[in-house]
Amino acid sequence: RLPLNIGEFARVLGGGIVPGSIVLVGGDPGIGKSTLMLQVAMELARGGTVLYVSGEESERQIKMRALRLLRQNGGDTGAEAMPEGLLLVTETSLSVILEHISAVNPMLLVLDSIQTTYLPELESSAGSVTQVRECASRLRELAKSSGMAAFLIGHVTKEGAIAGPRVLEHIVDT
């Protein structure tokens, strides 16, 4: 397991992140999913390569949030404060994301969000049942074969269920 110093979150994961696991992180809009995942990414990037992919925010927005996290934790907020192993990418095409993964071989992928990610060869739009299922399935196969852990951030519906196909909940490990 990859150890985490984020107590309650590490406890939920059984003490840390299992290499090759795929975890779905869901919750209401604005509750802090992206911030929590950025905090995890920043911590792990101090010991290896972490790829944080956002289809929701610009690189500048992510960096501003990272600096806010560093300030809250009493850390250095200079340019050198960002962990060297943290790679930020703004992208929604899974084909391009897979190229980035292949190029840097991260120990952890954070994808924000699975509903904004799409495969160009499928005719349906991002967030559709087919797109969400296929993107999650391909990422699961990659995680299992490479040992890369992956966190998929997922939106929820007004009823509190993960948006997209119910099969998504069965594709992930946690």
Pin down the residues of each PLM region.
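The Walker A/P-loop phosphate-binding site
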Residues: 1-69, 75, 98, 102
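Gly-rich Lys/Arg/Thr-decorated short loops/hinges at beta-loop-alpha junctions or inter-strand turns
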Residues: 19-23, 112-122
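Flexible beta-alpha connector loops of hexameric P-loop NTPases
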Residues: 26, 82-91, 118-133, 160
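Proline-aspartate-enriched helix->loop->beta-strand connector
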Residues: 99-111
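Phosphate-binding/switch region of NTP-binding enzymes
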Residues: 133, 137-174
